[in-house]
Regions:
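Sequence termini and other peripheral, non-core segments
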Residues: 1-16, 22-25, 29-33, 47-85, ...
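Conserved, mostly hydrophobic/aromatic
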Residues: 40
């Protein structure tokens, strides 16, 4: 499971679609609707949040916004916060999903690690996207601008829950 801290516009097609599916799974886990993945490290930051389902819904909305921008069709009815299930927060795109959800801090070291990880993955599977990614990174300028809209970049190293790999 990979729930990227990076802005969805930086993710290639495979990463964006996989992140959507895996975050929908995370939403189910946080609702207690599945027995698997309950101790997955990627869920730690959402569980630490006062309203984890609302945070996951806002995160999913950010992915869906990017999907819309690319002409993909992610089912927003699957986004839902609170106890009532799917569709509660996701169907209406007119209201910003981030308006009532305080930002979650993400260390710059985590963003840097994830960006390196993404670049490594993209280099092996989609050279065309690698070129686009480099242009998008240059346009953003600083690493802090590379965070998903739900996250706020703060000083720090890689998150303790991250299972790092050498590239």
């Amino acid at each position: 499971m990979r729930i990227w801290s990076l802005h969805p516009s930086l993710l290639d097609c495979r990463a964006l679609v996989a992140c959507w599916r895996e975050t929908l799974l995370a939403q189910k886990v946080l609702r207690g609707l599945t027995r698997g993945y309950t101790n997955h490290p990627q869920l730690i930051r959402f569980r630490a949040y006062p309203q984890p389902l609302e945070a996951v819904a806002a995160y999913l909305a950010g992915l869906a916004d990017e999907a819309d921008a690319r002409g993909y069709s992610f089912n927003r009815a699957l986004i839902g916060a609170g106890e009532h299930g799917a569709g509660e927060n996701g169907a209406d795109k007119t209201e910003s999903p981030y308006a009532s959800v305080p930002l979650i801090p993400v260390p710059l070291g985590q963003l840097e690690y994830e960006l390196t990880f993404l670049q490594h993955k993209v280099a092996g599977r989609d050279p065309e996207w690698e070129h686009r990614l480099n242009k998008r990174l240059a346009a953003r300028g600083e690493l802090a601008a590379c965070a998903h809209p739900l996250f706020e970049a703060v000083p720090g190293t890689i998150e303790p829950w991250e299972k790092t790999k050498d590239f």
